Amino acid sequence: MKINEKIQEDEKKQSDVLKKYGRKDRHFRQRIICAVILLVLSAFFMILSALIPDFAEWYSEHVYPVWVSTLGRFSGLFPFSLSEILIYFLLLVFVASLIRLIVSVIRICRKRGRSGERTGEERESETPSPAALAASWLSRVLLVVGILAFLYTVFCGINYHRHSFSEEEGIVTYQYSVEELKKICIWLTEEVNSRVGNVLRDENGIMKLEAPEADGAVEAMETLAKEFSALQGYYPRPKSLLISEVLSYQNLSGIYLPFTVEANYNGDMTAYNIPFTACHELSHLRGFMQEEEANFIAFLACLSSDRSDFQYSGYLSGWVYCMNALYRADYNAWQEVRVTLTEEAEPDLAANNAFWDSYRGTISETAERINDTYLKANGQAEGVQSYNRMVDLIVAYFS
């Protein structure tokens, strides 16, 4: 009985301390309530869009474009990625606040140890308990998580459940033969060979971009939108990350950061990848989140561009994806096509392989597994392999 009374007494003291500290931290309850509301709303909209695709389609066509033309337009005023800066800032604040919490808890424990002659009530009335400090800190973290989850949902998550681009434009994929795939690969090889001499190259024979790639990507997407109405709308300029190594170590060529509605790409990678990647990320700003469709849209956008470097980027990127598919389907057929690629394109492929190989390791493998899980959680059953499904769309569209 005495033990139970002691436990109840301790719980009462902790509750009293939290109440006392709660008067000092007046916004504790408000933070918890706001965080819970935001998390519940996020879950509600994600479930609703998954159960009712027509809601997701309506949202993508009528609500999401408002965010792109307002917040996306605002963030586009800055030459750097606002989301990148925001993420670095939040990480810095998180680490600093955690260190401050730990230091404060240690100081309180030491202070109470030195003032052992005072009564418990006297000590608790002077300073909050470590539990109260931790609760206050966690409430702030929870609020930030709630805000980010809600922003992710309204600026990205719902779009995962909209109708696909192929459905919107009546492109029907089918089970094609190896011969059909081989014909596409031959066509792409011929296109690469005919354009390889039209791009600028450095002393090592590696492609260089002609002009700022961001403007070229916007122009390419706007040109393609004249043919496909689902792509019409405002496009902010895509941006290279200030620290592109963050993406390199994750084996990522680009990323759509929904918190500020920005398309970002890896500025360190081989130049031929950049136009294709910039258009890929911009396609997400039209609400098409499926990776294979973003790849296909980027492919079409590069082909529709007036710039030689964009055309070359599109054809060579499409060539890589389709040739990889042919390699898996029929090695002999792959060999027949592979030897017809001009030697002038080889430096680009070699530089690309060398670049990604230099970052291959535990970090990139872990990041790829995380990305795979993320894509599967958002309805892309094949995970990171879904990027390769653009081949199905290319064959269906051009055969």
Please tell me what each predicted stretch does:
Residues 79, 276-288, 292-295, 299-300:
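Active-site recognition of the HExxH zinc-binding catalytic motif
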Residues 199-267, 271:
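Auxiliary, metal-adjacent structural segments of Zn-dependent hydrolase domains
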Residues 344-399:
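Pan-zinc metallopeptidase signature
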Residues 2-3, 7-27, 104-135:
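Membrane-interfacial, low-structure loops and terminal tails that flank and connect transmembrane helices
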Residues 289-333:
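Post-HExxH zinc-binding segment in Zn-dependent metallohydrolases
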Residues 41-108:
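Membrane-embedded alpha-helical segments of integral membrane proteins
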Residues 87, 94-100, 132-166:
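Transmembrane alpha-helices and immediately adjacent membrane-cytoplasm interface residues
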Residues 157-229:
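Membrane-interface segments at or immediately adjacent to transmembrane helices
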